[in-house]
Amino acid sequence: MSITAERKAALIKEYATVEGDTGSPEVQVAILTERINNLTDHFKDHKKDNHSRRGLLTMVSSRRSLLDYLKKKDEGRYSKLIGSLGIRR
């Protein structure tokens, strides 16, 4: 259900702007997207898990805020990120 440390490190390495960058919006959105995808798979088997569904909605909202910030600051980075992650917008 959660992402492994190896997968998280791979996401950080792939989306980091500089070496060791874990706080950029791209990295945060990539990690949130991975967690959201894992939870949506979880809900296919556990339809009544409303406690986790609330966490999913919180993650989606947080990702949306980060994407809005990135779009406001640099639209080129924003469009590149949603293209590589496969997020529709």
Curated annotation (Swiss-Prot):
GO terms for biological process: translation. InterPro entries: Ribosomal_uS15, Ribosomal_uS15_bac-type, uS15_NS1_RNA-bd_sf. It comes from the Bacteria. Keywords: Ribonucleoprotein, Ribosomal protein, RNA-binding, rRNA-binding. SUPFAM superfamilies: S15/NS1 RNA-binding domain. One of its GO terms (cellular component) is cytosolic small ribosomal subunit. Coiled coil: none annotated. GO terms for molecular function: rRNA binding; structural constituent of ribosome. It holds the Pfam family Ribosomal_S15. Belongs to the universal ribosomal protein uS15 family. One of the primary rRNA binding proteins, it binds directly to 16S rRNA where it helps nucleate assembly of the platform of the 30S subunit by binding and bridging several RNA helices of the 16S rRNA. Forms an intersubunit bridge (bridge B4) with the 23S rRNA of the 50S subunit in the ribosome. Part of the 30S ribosomal subunit. Forms a bridge to the 50S subunit in the 70S ribosome, contacting the 23S rRNA. This is Small ribosomal subunit protein uS15. It comes from Rhizobium rhizogenes (strain K84 / ATCC BAA-868) (Agrobacterium radiobacter). The gene is rpsO.
